[in-house]
Amino acid sequence: MRKRVAIGLLVLLAASLSAAAAADDLKGADAILCTAVQAMVCTEDGDCVVDNPWAFNIPQFLEVDLKAKKVSTTKASGEERSSPLRTVERDADVIYLQGLENGRAFSLVINESSGMLSAAVARDGKSVGVFGACTPMPSPMPTK
């Protein structure tokens, strides 16, 4: 009996690992959910601080809509923040996103195969770097 339970757990673990690995493939995805994992803020005097993204008021999750050319906080965050994207480009397995709003220039670079995210925001006297991961957002359920 113990052997069956162990085998069952291994099968479940293998299935969940393969699903997680497939979930990060962004090829063809137009709606992407990204999470910030680590952030660094630097000021013009050379001081830099590394901390959790939320310590710098960086949203934990961002929804990226490539068709609508916008990046937004999730509804669950209650923040209702959204920024337009001026540039949306896919090239050589990488998604490049750029925007400009409220005196800030921002860029996101997302690897389509791994879902890994590198982002930067710059404004006068301050820059922010963020590392994270992205996954395709599920399609909405069809209504009957």
Regions found by a protein language model. Give the residues of each.
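N-terminal signal peptide c-region/cleavage motif recognized by signal peptidases
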Residues: A15-A19
